[in-house]
């Protein structure tokens, strides 16, 4: 009987810890969302196609407004073999860059600060570009 009681207590504690971690993750995401939405300016993105699919950057640029961004420049990446898309942060604060990356499907963020850059960030499209389209089409518009 004592063993059963110990197992039940351990189960309740582990469920509580798991829900606490989920709550903390949700709070972090909400904080990033608030940080992103706090800025009045639309984020200027340079979109570089690294997937080899012709016209992909132009296609995705049409729905970027849903993430509070607009395309400042469309171009090809340095090569067309990017397996994974990523966001290169040039001028955004860290919280805004990560909030934008979350709205674009949870992309990794690479920091290459350049205050003289023409765009706030560079979106490099890789072979996993569908996750960006899905994220943009299934989220509420920011602006």
In which residue ranges do the predicted regions lie?
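Short, low-complexity, Pro/Ser/Thr/Gly-rich segments in the mature regions of secreted, periplasmic
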Residues: 131-142
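Hydrophobic membrane-insertion alpha-helices, especially the h-region
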Residues: 1-16
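Short low-complexity stretches enriched in small and charged residues
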Residues: 2-3, 39-46, 76-83
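N-terminal hydrophobic targeting segments that direct proteins to the cell envelope
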Residues: 16-36
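Solvent-exposed alpha-helical segments and adjacent loops
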Residues: 1, 142-143
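BRCT (BRCA1 C-terminal) domain core and associated BRCT-interaction motifs
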Residues: 59-63, 67-130
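Generic detector of short, locally flexible boundary/turn motifs and exposed helical patches
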Residues: 10-12, 36-38, 50-54, 85-91
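Short extracytoplasmic
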Residues: 34-66
């Amino acid at each position: 009987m004592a063993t059963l009681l110990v197992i039940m207590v351990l189960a309740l504690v582990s469920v509580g810890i798991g829900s606490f971690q989920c709550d903390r993750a949700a709070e972090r995401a909400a904080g990033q969302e608030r940080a992103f939405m706090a800025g009045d300016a639309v984020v200027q993105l340079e979109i570089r196609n690294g997937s080899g699919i012709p016209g992909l950057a132009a296609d995705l640029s049409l729905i970027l407004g849903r993430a509070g961004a607009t395309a400042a420049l469309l171009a090809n990446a340095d090569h067309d073999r990017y397996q994974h898309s990523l966001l290169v942060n040039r001028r955004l604060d860290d919280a805004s860059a990560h909030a934008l990356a979350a709205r674009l499907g949870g992309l990794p963020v690479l920091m290459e600060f350049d205050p003289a850059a023409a765009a706030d960030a560079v979106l490099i499209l890789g072979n996993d570009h569908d996750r960006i389209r899905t994220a943009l089409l299934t989220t509420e518009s920011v602006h």
